[in-house]
């Protein structure tokens, strides 16, 4: 019977066949230890010389790293391994022999590994990170489906920028200028006026010449928009959502977190509600910590976010940023015209902002004023203005950056390890 490594616990003391690649091996005179992987997991196969034919043992000792195999044997429990099971091998059939595999068990530099990203993905650590990424995506759909949201797919090619910035990738759209989307938010607001509560999940693009460990040129975002939802209710949805994905990863990715040596105690305490501080309070906190490079009215950089997060062992909301450093569509605070009803969610352990969100302007006259202030004219933005003409309602939304969230939950240092094929300032291949 052919099974996967993940199915092995269901077949204890049974003889099965697994299609796998040889990730590593070691051998003595009488025993060969095969480290097998098949995409669903990793498992050790033990080949004992006295229990198999001469040909099988010779093959097991000489097969090269990353060769593909059919391995047959009996599944037994192995309490010493993280997986908990191993195979007592009776036969090895080589499908394809790999020669001179470039990523050997020794240490390699980052640039070398990035040049071979298509192969680096096969490693145990990268496999674990991708499985955690997958669990975050799975639990995202689970949460929003359970809460009555409708999945909507906004366009990737747009005629405008959601943020009103210049950090856009331009492309020709027949006889017109088009851009790769920075955010699906404007379209999601339109969808919310039709469907109530919606969310999208897709790639976004920022032409930022940034080389920090938190930035990618192409990254994926989860972007919910909600009609009849005001700022505080949106914050509650955000913290419940983040709590849900963290607990899902803890429940369903125990082995992967162990492979990554992640400190589980730091994740186990991530449960709503999250602390909230205002932008004003954050500025005061930074001053008390000795920061003299930030003044009221300026946005926070990575060192500032890290310093603020150090005061908490949970994600923390920073609310009510100055109007002038936030996007044109954010609703002013009812008691202060200089700040808006928005929040950034800062992850602990130095992982920075993982969510940005706000209540959106729902008043036509105020939005027209914002258009004028930001120089937003023409058909690219006219349709968005019309959302305030026909049955406008209070509404809010937010965007969660998937890769930063993966980095935080898996504990990896750089976001380049959180997406299969990262697009960086100096890297378009592989």
UniProtKB/Swiss-Prot annotation:
A Gene Ontology term for the protein's cellular component: cytoplasm
Enzyme Commission (EC) number: 6.1.1.22
Origin: domain of life: Bacteria
Compartment list: Cytoplasm
A GO term for molecular function: ATP binding
Pfam families xrefs: tRNA-synt_2 (PF00152), tRNA_anti-codon (PF01336)
Catalysed reaction, written as an equation: tRNA(Asn) + L-asparagine + ATP = L-asparaginyl-tRNA(Asn) + AMP + diphosphate + H(+)
Protein known as: Asparagine--tRNA ligase
Organism of derivation: Oceanobacillus iheyensis (strain DSM 14371 / CIP 107618 / JCM 11309 / KCTC 3954 / HTE831)
């Amino acid at each position: 019977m052919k099974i996967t490594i993940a199915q092995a616990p269901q077949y204890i003391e049974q003889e099965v066949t697994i299609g796998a690649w040889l990730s590593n091996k070691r051998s003595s005179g009488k025993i060969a230890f095969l480290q097998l992987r098949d995409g669903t997991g990793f498992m050790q196969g033990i080949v004992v010389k006295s229990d198999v034919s001469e040909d099988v043992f010779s093959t097991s000792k000489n097969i090269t790293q990353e060769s593909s195999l059919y391995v047959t044997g009996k599944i037994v429990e192995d309490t010493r391994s993280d997986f908990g099971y191993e195979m007592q091998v009776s036969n090895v059939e080589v499908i394809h022999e790999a020669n001179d595999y470039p990523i050997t068990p020794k240490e390699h530099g980052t640039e070398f590994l990035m040049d071979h990203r298509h192969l680096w993905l096969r490693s145990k650590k990268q496999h674990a990170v991708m499985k955690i990424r997958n669990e975050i995506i799975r639990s995202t759909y689970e949460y929003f489906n359970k809460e009555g949201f409708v999945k909507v797919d906004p366009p990737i090619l747009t005629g405008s920028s959601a943020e009103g910035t210049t950090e856009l990738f331009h492309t020709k759209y027949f006889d017109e200028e088009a851009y790769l989307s920075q955010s699906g938010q404007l379209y999601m607001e339109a969808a919310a006026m039709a469907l109530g509560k919606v969310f999208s999940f897709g790639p976004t693009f920022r032409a930022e010449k940034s080389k920090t460990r938190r930035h990618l040129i192409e990254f994926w975002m989860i972007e919910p928009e909600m009609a009849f939802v005001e700022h505080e209710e949106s914050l509650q949805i955000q913290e419940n959502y983040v709590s849900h994905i963290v607990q899902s990863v803890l429940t369903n990715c125990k082995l992967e977190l162990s492979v990554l040596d992640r400190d589980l105690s730091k994740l186990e305490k991530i449960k709503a509600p999250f602390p909230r501080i205002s932008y004003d309070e954050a500025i005061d906190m930074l001053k008390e910590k000795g920061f003299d490079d930030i003044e009221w009215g300026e946005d926070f950089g990575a060192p500032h976010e890290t310093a603020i997060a150090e005061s908490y062992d949970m994600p923390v909301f920073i609310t009510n940023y100055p109007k002038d450093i936030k996007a044109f569509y954010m609703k002013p605070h009812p008691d202060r015209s200089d700040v808006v009803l928005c929040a950034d969610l800062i992850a602990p352990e130095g992982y920075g902002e993982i969510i940005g969100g706000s209540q959106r302007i729902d008043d036509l006259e105020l939005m027209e004023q914002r258009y004028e202030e930001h120089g937003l004219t023409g058909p690219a933005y006219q349709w968005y203005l019309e959302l305030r003409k026909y049955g406008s309602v209070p509404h809010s939304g937010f965007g969660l950056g998937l890769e930063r969230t993966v980095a935080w939950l898996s504990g990896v240092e750089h976001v380049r390890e959180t997406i299969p094929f990262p697009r960086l300032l100096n890297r378009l291949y592989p």
